[in-house]
């Protein structure tokens, strides 16, 4: 096996498995809560929409941490790599504290932005107040995972996720349905299970992080001062990612609000497809993570031709994988929607939405690899910010509103039209990739 394939598999496979586990984490929640009816499914889905904003913002911090750590490890500069981790860690704690306060104190007001259904808001507020406390452990574990992946210890976050899913599944069964003497808590039980599983995930990653540091003979450094770059450079790098990811997630929330106003059945149909969409994207997300680390290390060593060649090979692998998985999803979509105890019409809408998603999946995956891994690895994050803003707010959102309120289409038509913005992203990203101006060494 070539060195390229060894490095790719060492990073991509654990990250892929971890992403799939995290997506299955959502599927377990959805299927179990789905037994409680459409109101609870919708409530959890809307809470997830707000949590998505947190996830992408903290993911932006983790992305910058990964860019810096990968490049400086490639350049054999341990001190700068630790500084990248420490600064990102502080940013993550501040952001998670803000989201904790917002979702813990104002759950009903936040949910009211998505739906006017009082029952959904009431159920969602109970769920929201509990999962708000999971934001801090999620932030810490996400940033520590960036370090572990760059050091090619991606198996540790995967094992942590595996354990967390097992904990979540077991506690869901006990607390949602009141088995083995536990109280029957419904949606509240699902929230408690989620919180405990995230605490388990954090504990596992922290132990693994300490073990790996000792194994490598590294010394933990607390440093908030860069030497190769300035703090201003860090802010210039992270700000476009924060802006683009926040606006993208806000756009997702606007789209969800539109879905919510299409009616409870349409919202339920879309919500039940979200976990499987996350599972499919997660199945190929390892390639994006591997691209960021592998290409970043090449750039850190100023091996520009090697970085370009590796980027193309990863993109080819992503295309083949996406087409294969999409074909399987089209064949199995009906089986998945059949797992839910909802009306037949909701199942059929969900099945059609999954087929539409499968047709767009290869484009989505290539965008994920290019925008989320390759182009960002050079540190010039402004390019992706512009693509994201134009794609979401100048194309996706207007098409969504046009389809829903002018054409008055249903959920399938609205979703199909707005997803065409992925094609714009891919065309522009490919043009930028071929020009090679994104290939910058920070060392």
Task: Give names to the regions the model predicted.
Residues 1-15, 69-136, 182-239, 295-360, ...:
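Short alpha-helical transmembrane segments in multi-pass integral membrane proteins
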Residues 15, 19, 30-31, 48, ...:
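Transmembrane alpha-helix boundary and packing residues in multipass membrane permease domains
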Residues 17, 21, 25, 54-58, ...:
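Residue-level hotspots within pore-lining transmembrane alpha-helices
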């Amino acid at each position: 096996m070539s060195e390229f394939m060894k490095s790719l598999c060492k990073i991509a496979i654990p990250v892929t498995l971890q992403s799939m586990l995290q997506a299955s984490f959502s599927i377990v929640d959805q299927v179990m809560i789905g037994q409680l009816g459409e109101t609870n499914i919708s409530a959890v889905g809307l809470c997830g929409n707000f949590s998505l904003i947190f996830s992408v913002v903290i993911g932006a911090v983790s992305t910058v941490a990964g860019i810096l750590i990968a490049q400086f490890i490639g350049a054999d500069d341990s001190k700068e790599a630790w500084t990248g981790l420490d600064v990102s860690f502080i940013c993550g704690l501040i952001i998670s504290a803000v989201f904790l306060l917002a979702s813990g104190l104002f759950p009903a007001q936040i949910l009211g932005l998505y739906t006017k259904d009082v029952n959904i808001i009431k159920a969602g507020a109970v769920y929201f107040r509990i999962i708000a406390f999971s934001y801090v452990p999620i932030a810490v574990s996400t940033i520590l995972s960036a370090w572990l992946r760059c050091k090619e210890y991606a198996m540790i976050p995967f094992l942590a996720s595996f354990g967390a899913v097992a904990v979540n599944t077991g506690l869901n069964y006990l607390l949602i349905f009141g088995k083995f003497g536990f109280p029957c808590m419904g949606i509240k039980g699902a929230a408690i299970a989620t919180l405990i599983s995230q605490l388990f995930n954090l504990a596992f990653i922290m132990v693994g992080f300490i073990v790996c540091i000792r194994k490598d003979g590294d010394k933990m450094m607390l440093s908030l001062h860069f030497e190769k770059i300035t703090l201003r450079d860090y802010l210039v790098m992270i700000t476009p990612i924060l802006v683009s990811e926040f606006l993208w997630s806000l756009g997702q929330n606007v789209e969800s609000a539109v879905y919510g106003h299409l009616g409870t059945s349409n919202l339920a149909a879309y919500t039940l497809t979200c976990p499987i969409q996350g599972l499919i994207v997660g199945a190929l997300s390892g390639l994006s993570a591997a691209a960021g680390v592998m290409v970043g290390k090449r750039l850190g060593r100023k091996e520009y031709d090697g970085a370009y060649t590796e980027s193309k090979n990863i993109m080819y692998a992503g295309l083949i994988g996406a087409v294969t998985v999409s074909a399987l999803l089209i064949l199995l979509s009906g089986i998945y929607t059949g797992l839910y105890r909802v009306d037949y019409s909701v199942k059929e809408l969900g099945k059609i939405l999954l087929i539409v998603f499968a047709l767009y999946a290869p484009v989505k995956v290539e965008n994920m690899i290019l925008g989320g891994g390759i182009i960002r690895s050079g540190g010039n994050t402004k390019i992706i910010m512009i693509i994201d803003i134009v794609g979401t707010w100048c194309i996706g959102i207007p098409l969504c509103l046009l389809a829903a309120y002018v054409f008055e289409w249903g959920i399938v038509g609205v979703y199909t039209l707005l997803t065409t913005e992925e094609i714009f992203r891919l065309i522009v990203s490919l043009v930028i990739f071929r020009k090679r101006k994104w290939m910058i060494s920070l060392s």
